[in-house]
Structures are given as structure tokens and as C-alpha cells.
């Protein structure tokens, strides 16, 4: 017999993990299904060393550490976390949903989508023949910072993440350079100010025109935008941060038909989608005034969970405070 859950949360990033914790506080039988081999979502998978400063209660915390703390918090209340498992179909039944994954099948009374931007892949350099250098001399994901200690590093990109990486490596690298194809950076004003005050060498407006493996490190040709001028440079390693292409293509294979706006799930003020007992939170939703912050997602989770519990168990006791559960 297929196991029945009150709430199945699809997505184990910060939004899904905190919603799973709160669902456990409401004593809902809850599971989280995450396609990646670790909890924490895109931030933890792609930028584990990145510092996060906009989560309440932390002056600053590494993405990997935030993910670990959220996972630990979620497991405290008995919420099950299923890693490395992908939802391949959701079928509507009379008063529940049948969820099929690549590994198992489950029944659930309600679904909470916390899928973020869906599957994501890095935008790579437009230079052929570099695959053999990936994760050796060219990086599209951030490994442990120790990989870059006492080395000459080039970071390519113009957004907040590229600036964050350059500033994070500044204290440990031999030298840090940041190349961007525009004169102005797209980062937040405070980040750009920190960059200007740092020892990071900024090279603008340049585009990477060629990369060649050297005996030690790599040779990088930079082309100045608007001219034919080329600059020959040499670095030990290159970190490319051109952003990511994302899609929720897997959802197109599901039997249920969810309304989307600009490839995001359309929800109301209670995080409800167009389908009964299916809710959505986090970066993958759209509503008036939506802010794509982890802190915002932390608030959306309890709103959705409380509404689910009101729908499933109208007579059940309402929200509780955490101290009433853990201080006994």
C-alpha cells in the first residue's frame, strides 16, 4: 500500500526546508523530495562558500552552513527528507495526489512546490575545446576556497555573485582580477563599493576571447569591447560566473496543469495555485510585490502550511510557538 502524507514538499532548498520544519511543528506528516544529492538547493550546490548576509539572526553565514542548519532544524520535527530523488509525475485523484518519482511512489493530501528556478546549468564560455579543463583550471561552480589559495585567479562576470566570489577570495589568493564586458557592474551598490575599496584588479570593458592551457595555469586573451585590441594575460585558474539558464521543463511532463506567469507559479496571498491543495513558495512563484529573498521565502512557508492545515483539518488547533514544543 502506498504511504499517505499530509504534505509533500517538492524542493529541498531554504524555502522547502523551513516549510518542512514548520509543517512538522503543526504535526503534519510531511516529506521533502529533493533532486540534488544534498539539501540546500541552488545556493548550497553552486556557491557553498558564499556568505549570505540577508537572513535574520546571522551577521553572515556560509551558504553550506545555512543549508546544514536548516536541514538539522527540519529533522528535529520528524519531517522526512528524500535526497537524490526527482518527481516525474503528479496525478490528481479524488481527494489526494499520487506522486511518482524516479525511485518510488507516494500519496499525499497536499503538495507544496518549492522548486525555485527548476533545473539550472551554468552559462559557459563561448570558447571550444575547454571541457577537459573544467573543475581543474576553469570553474563554473565554486568548490572549497582552499582550491585557490596563493594563486593568481581571474573571475569573469559582472553581477553580485561574481563580485562576491572576488571579494571572498581576496584574502587567500595571491592576486584576484575581475573581468566584465561593461564599464558598470550589475551588483548592488554596497557590493560595488566594497569592490572599489578592495585590492581586486578590475578589468573593464573586456570579454574573454580565447583560453589556452599552459604548462602551469592558463593563458587568457581579453578583447576590449568596441575595439580590436587584445590583451594577453596569464592566471592559475579561471572562475566563470555568467549566470545560469534555468527551466521547470520537468513540470511539463506532470499530469496536473498549473497556471504560470513568466515561467513562475501564479499564487494568491495564501500561496495557493490554481489547483486544489497545491501551494507554491520561494523563487519559483509570482504575485504582486514578490521579493526573491531567502527571508521572504521563510515567511511564505508558514503561510502555505497553515492554509493547508486549515483545509485538511478545519477543527485542528492553530499555529503554535516553537518554545511550547521544545522547552518542556
From Swiss-Prot:
<feature type="binding site">
    <location>
        <position position="87"/>
    </location>
    <ligand>
        <name>FAD</name>
    </ligand>
</feature>
<dbReference type="GO" id="GO:0050661">
    <property type="term" value="F:NADP binding"/>
</dbReference>
<feature type="binding site">
    <location>
        <position position="120"/>
    </location>
    <ligand>
        <name>FAD</name>
    </ligand>
</feature>
<keyword id="KW-0274">FAD</keyword>
<feature type="binding site">
    <location>
        <position position="42"/>
    </location>
    <ligand>
        <name>FAD</name>
    </ligand>
</feature>
<comment type="similarity">
    <text>Belongs to the ferredoxin--NADP reductase type 2 family.</text>
</comment>
<feature type="binding site">
    <location>
        <position position="47"/>
    </location>
    <ligand>
        <name>FAD</name>
    </ligand>
</feature>
<dbReference type="GO" id="GO:0050660">
    <property type="term" value="F:flavin adenine dinucleotide binding"/>
</dbReference>
<dbReference type="Pfam" id="PF07992">
    <property type="entry name" value="Pyr_redox_2"/>
</dbReference>
<protein>
    <recommendedName>
        <fullName>Ferredoxin--NADP reductase</fullName>
        <ecNumber>1.18.1.2</ecNumber>
    </recommendedName>
</protein>
<dbReference type="GO" id="GO:0004324">
    <property type="term" value="F:ferredoxin-NADP+ reductase activity"/>
</dbReference>
<dbReference type="InterPro" id="IPR023753">
    <property type="entry name" value="FAD/NAD-binding_dom"/>
</dbReference>
<keyword id="KW-0521">NADP</keyword>
<dbReference type="InterPro" id="IPR022890">
    <property type="entry name" value="Fd--NADP_Rdtase_type_2"/>
</dbReference>
<feature type="binding site">
    <location>
        <position position="34"/>
    </location>
    <ligand>
        <name>FAD</name>
    </ligand>
</feature>
<dbReference type="InterPro" id="IPR036188">
    <property type="entry name" value="FAD/NAD-bd_sf"/>
</dbReference>
<feature type="binding site">
    <location>
        <position position="283"/>
    </location>
    <ligand>
        <name>FAD</name>
    </ligand>
</feature>
<keyword id="KW-0560">Oxidoreductase</keyword>
<dbReference type="InterPro" id="IPR050097">
    <property type="entry name" value="Ferredoxin-NADP_redctase_2"/>
</dbReference>
<keyword id="KW-0285">Flavoprotein</keyword>
<feature type="binding site">
    <location>
        <position position="323"/>
    </location>
    <ligand>
        <name>FAD</name>
    </ligand>
</feature>
<comment type="subunit">
    <text>Homodimer.</text>
</comment>
Amino acid at each position: 500500500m502506498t504511504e499517505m502524507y499530509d504534505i509533500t514538499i517538492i524542493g529541498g532548498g531554504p524555502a522547502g526546508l523551513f516549510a518542512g520544519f514548520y509543517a512538522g511543528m503543526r504535526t503534519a506528516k510531511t516529506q521533502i523530495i529533493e533532486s540534488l544529492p544534498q539539501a540546500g538547493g541552488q545556493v548550497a550546490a553552486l556557491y557553498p562558500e558564499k556568505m549570505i548576509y540577508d537572513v535574520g539572526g546571522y551577521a553572515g553565514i556560509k551558504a553550506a552552513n545555512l543549508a546544514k542548519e536548516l536541514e538539522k532544524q527540519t529533522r528535529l520535527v520528524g519531517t522526512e527528507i528524500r535526497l537524490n530523488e526527482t518527481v516525474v509525475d503528479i496525478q490528481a485523484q479524488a481527494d489526494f495526489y499520487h506522486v511518482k518519482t524516479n525511485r518510488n511512489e507516494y500519496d499525499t493530501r497536499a503538495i507544496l512546490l518549492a522548486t525555485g528556478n527548476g533545473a539550472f546549468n551554468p552559462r559557459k564560455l563561448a570558447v571550444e575545446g575547454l571541457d577537459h579543463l573544467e573543475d581543474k583550471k576553469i570553474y563554473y561552480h565554486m568548490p572549497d576556497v582552499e582550491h585557490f589559495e596563493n594563486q593568481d585567479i581571474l573571475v569573469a562576470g559582472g553581477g553580485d555573485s561574481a563580485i562576491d566570489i572576488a571579494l571572498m577570495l581576496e584574502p587567500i589568493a595571491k592576486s584576484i582580477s575581475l573581468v566584465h564586458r561593461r564599464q558598470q557592474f550589475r551588483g548592488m551598490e554596497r557590493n560595488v563599493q566594497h569592490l572599489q575599496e578592495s585590492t581586486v584588479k578590475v578589468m573593464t570593458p573586456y570579454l574573454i576571447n580565447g583560453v589556452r592551457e599552459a604548462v602551469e595555469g592558463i593563458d587568457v586573451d581579453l578583447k576590449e569591447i568596441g575595439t580590436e585590441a587584445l590583451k594577453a594575460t596569464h592566471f592559475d585558474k579561471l572562475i566563470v560566473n555568467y549566470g545560469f539558464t534555468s527551466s521547470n521543463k520537468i513540470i511539463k511532463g506532470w499530469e496536473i496543469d498549473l497556471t504560470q506567469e513568466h515561467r513562475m507559479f501564479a499564487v494568491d496571498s495564501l500561496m495557493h495555485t490554481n489547483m486544489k491543495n497545491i501551494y507554491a513558495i520561494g523563487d519559483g512563484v509570482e504575485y504582486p510585490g514578490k521579493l526573491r529573498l531567502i527571508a521572504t521565502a521563510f515567511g511564505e512557508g508558514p503561510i502555505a502550511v497553515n492554509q493547508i492545515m486549515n483545509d485538511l483539518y478545519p477543527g485542528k488547533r492553530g499555529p503554535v510557538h516553537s518554545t511550547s514544543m521544545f522547552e518542556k
